[in-house]
Amino acid sequence: MSNTVHVIVRSPRVAKPKEFTFPSDEKVGAAASQAGEAFGYPKGLNLTFENEKEQVLNRDQTLAQAGVDNGDKLELVDTGGGV
């Protein structure tokens, strides 16, 4: 298993997706917050990812535990409401 995961993240606010490489043991919530900052979201939101199966990932799991693999396409979502 790789120590990192390379993903493509889309945001409803920005047309062009961005690519990120995260440690596979990073929490989903922390990775989503980093991606959110790159897309210009304010800090303090409860951001997470939704995978291509439209499953919202648990912010408290690591990316590996959430089943995130290299090349996955993820959507940035706010669990506190719409972004």
PLM features: residue spans?
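Ubiquitin system architectures
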Residues: M1-V83
